[in-house]
Amino acid sequence: MAIIIPSRLSSTRLKQKPLQLIGSITLIERVFKQVNQAGLEHTYVATDSEEIASVITKVGGKVIFTDSAIPTGTDRTYEAFKLIPNNQNINYIVNVQGDMPFIEPSSILKIIEYLKNSKYDIVTPIVKVDRESVKASSNVTVVVDSAGTALYFSRSLIPNGAEEFLYHVGMYGFRKNALEKFVSLKPTFLEKTERLEQLRALENGMTIGTCLVENVPISVDTEEDLKKAVKFYENISKLGL
């Protein structure tokens, strides 16, 4: 089992996003520390940046350098996976986005549990939310069948007319052969239209299972998101959490 956190220094909406401070600690360090609490031996940050690498190694983390030209987080995850020593013994890979500073380790463990106890190619977490919680265009919703198998992901609110939705949390657990297959596939029409790479898997007949988790994690993509993350940190610090 390996957890890989892709983290690229360049960001279009928030300059040097991984190095932005939340309190006295950078975003990427907070993500790493949360993920590391899952207690798995193979936890890596995959990056193109010496600065990010320095932050992670100073707190005892492991780094794998990947090319800055790699187009997606999943592609970066696979490139990093190939460089893990003795990776032939690793059968499951979890891709955790590097912009969720308060991600709950229990969500990662739940992904792993679902992967091991199902036949899905990919497993990803979801949260039940109301309409007010998913108004932002950056939010992604998903529709599933009665068994929890993902049918479609969208940046639009789906299903249309509903008052409760399934919010998609941007983490993916892959079987090794599924990750290898995914990166071998070309970007698809729906993937490019929605700007959601998981649709590449669905369009090519791969199965994505969903596991229900309790909380929507804060994700930092913009300056406004960063302010919210800082405010959240200040609030939990006051409570001693």
From Swiss-Prot:
Task: Give me the reactions it catalyses.
Answer: 3-deoxy-alpha-D-manno-oct-2-ulosonate + CTP = CMP-3-deoxy-beta-D-manno-octulosonate + diphosphate
Any Gene Ontology CC annotation: cytosol
Superkingdom assignment = Bacteria
SUPFAM superfamilies found in the cross-reference section: Nucleotide-diphospho-sugar transferases
**Annotated Pfam families:** CTP_transf_3
What keywords is this UniProt entry annotated with?
A: Cytoplasm, Lipopolysaccharide biosynthesis, Nucleotidyltransferase, Transferase
Q: What is its EC number?
A: 2.7.7.38
Single GO BP term: CMP-keto-3-deoxy-D-manno-octulosonic acid biosynthetic process
Q: What CDD domains does UniProt report for this protein, alphabetically?
A: CMP-KDO-Synthetase
Describe which pathway this protein belongs to, using the record's wording: Nucleotide-sugar biosynthesis; CMP-3-deoxy-D-manno-octulosonate biosynthesis; CMP-3-deoxy-D-manno-octulosonate from 3-deoxy-D-manno-octulosonate and CTP: step 1/1; Bacterial outer membrane biogenesis; lipopolysaccharide biosynthesis
Subcellular localization = Cytoplasm
GO terms of molecular function: 3-deoxy-manno-octulosonate cytidylyltransferase activity
Where is this protein chiefly located? cytoplasm
Gene3D superfamilies attached here?
Spore Coat Polysaccharide Biosynthesis Protein SpsA, Chain A (3.90.550.10)
Instruction: Quote the function comment for this protein.
Output: Activates KDO (a required 8-carbon sugar) for incorporation into bacterial lipopolysaccharide in Gram-negative bacteria.
- Designated name of the protein: 3-deoxy-manno-octulosonate cytidylyltransferase
| Gene source species | Rickettsia rickettsii (strain Sheila Smith)
Q: What lineage does the source organism belong to?
A: Bacteria, Pseudomonadati, Pseudomonadota, Alphaproteobacteria, Rickettsiales
